[in-house]
């Protein structure tokens, strides 16, 4: 038990005198005598539940083939307030317009929304397990042991009006192609690999959060530097365009062009006076940061294979690449 651990530790250190002296305050000792103990791990943890749903359809004709799927995943984590949702889709269409002409496209998209709990599980192992978690009216005790400010209630951040940490992520991949077969043995394929990405993180710790009382004391009131909101945004756009010329699998030429760009922004503001706005009402007094990167590249590849008498294979290739990242 907790009291036995305290006794043993103090006896080993040679500092044990009385049970009451083991506690940080008379109020904490009183809570022990009244049997007011808290299992912090049990209060923070919950049974995790995962749900997965999927729907797919496929079909086609002699010249057309298609596939479509929808997927949804909902995960409730082991910490109260931790959840993770994923929506995704996949679509593919291939169509032969003429015997010498085919087109197609493959598209994949996903949207992820996650709420992250303030899951400092280590705190549940080292926090004093004394007192009561809730007041008689059902509200959360800031200090589980009244009058003893040495322990702050670990459940404060389960209130979404004082603490939020969520992420949103969107990704789209698009891969169209066209294939031309002008004469026997000759194939020309042009394909595009494009992707869009958007990631946003919203964070808020307000008046009444665990960090607020841990930083400013259990009797804190009003705003302070520990009350702040933060937004991180990342946008990316990339594509690669390839043209592949093949003749009898012996001669191949590839041209490749790629473009990559990323736009990042970050904003933070502290001393927020009203929890109601969360991160939605920042003014010009906060910290703002932005960054933009872009690069382009071009590649040329040629390859010739020649087989003689079915015994000897001769191969020659050449490649040349250029990138804006290498520019002086």
How would you describe each model-predicted region?
Residues 70-76, 315-323:
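Transmembrane beta-strand segments that form the barrel wall of outer-membrane beta-barrel proteins
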């Amino acid at each position: 038990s907790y009291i036995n651990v305290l006794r043993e530790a103090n006896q080993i250190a040679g500092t044990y005198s009385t049970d009451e002296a083991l506690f940080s305050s008379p109020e904490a000792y009183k809570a022990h005598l009244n049997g007011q103990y808290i299992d912090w791990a049990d209060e923070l943890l919950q049974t995790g539940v995962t749900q997965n749903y999927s729907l797919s359809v496929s079909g086609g004709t002699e010249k057309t083939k298609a596939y479509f799927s929808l997927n949804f995943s909902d995960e409730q984590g082991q910490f109260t307030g931790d959840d993770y949702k994923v929506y995704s889709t996949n679509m593919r269409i291939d169509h032969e317009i003429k015997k010498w002409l085919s087109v197609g496209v493959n598209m994949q998209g996903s949207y992820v929304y996650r709420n992250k709990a303030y899951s400092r599980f280590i705190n549940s192992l080292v926090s004093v397990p004394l007192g009561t978690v809730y007041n008689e009216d059902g509200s959360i005790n800031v200090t589980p042991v009244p009058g003893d400010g040495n322990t702050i209630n670990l459940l404060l951040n389960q209130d979404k009006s004082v603490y939020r940490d969520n992420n949103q992520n969107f990704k789209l991949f698009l891969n169209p192609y066209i294939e031309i077969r002008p004469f026997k043995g000759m194939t020309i394929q042009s394909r595009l690999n494009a992707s869009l990405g958007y990631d946003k993180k919203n964070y808020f710790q307000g008046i009444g959060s665990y960090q607020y009382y841990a930083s400013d004391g259990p009797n804190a009131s009003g705003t302070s530097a520990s009350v702040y909101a933060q937004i991180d945004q990342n946008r990316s756009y990339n594509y690669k365009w390839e043209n592949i010329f093949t003749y009898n699998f012996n001669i191949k030429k590839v041209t490749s062009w790629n473009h990559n760009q990323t736009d990042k922004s970050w904003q933070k503001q502290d001393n927020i006076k009203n929890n109601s706005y969360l991160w939605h009402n920042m003014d010009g007094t906060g910290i703002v940061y932005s960054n933009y990167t872009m690069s382009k590249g071009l590649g040329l590849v040629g390859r010739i294979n020649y087989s003689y008498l079915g015994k000897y294979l001769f191969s020659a290739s050449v490649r040349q690449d250029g990138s804006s990242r290498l520019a002086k």
